Amino acid sequence: IRLGSDMGKLPAPFIDTATGDPTVLPMVFPSAPSAAMKTAAALTASWAGRLAYWRGADFPVYFNEAPAGEHFVVFVTNTARPTFLKDFPKVEGPQISVGDAPNSLAEKMLIVAGRDDADLIAAMKALGRGSSVMIGDTFKPAAQQEPERRKAYDAPRWLDTDQKVPFSRLIEY
């Protein structure tokens, strides 16, 4: 049974937090990805890794081809796209969509799209912040202000070992 394409279900089906298995999330690029496209992929890996947490994550890379039998992320601009998305409509800004993977009966693809490379980065930053409500098959983030830079050693899961750390801070239910 093919699932509907709904951004509201994210991170499913791309990340399964109900099992103890590591996340495997292939990244698909056009034949020659730009440095900014790779930055968007790094932001995607950071988002997925944060959600996979202790389960671990692996990000196999594909160029110009869709992986068989797996959900995956694909990066698309109006001028650079894998051939299997040659008919994907041009976009007018940062956009993330969920669609049916080609040649598959059940898998989905997360399409990170933009007019240019900067839009890809903007789309993934918006998704990574997780502050927007996403409904339907497409999310078009509005322009967002960059958050203030974090202080050194201020990461969300950082434990300050200069003081006592209660065991309860190490457990997540």
Positions of predicted regions on the chain:
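Solvent-exposed alpha-helical segments and adjacent loops
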Residues: I1-Y173
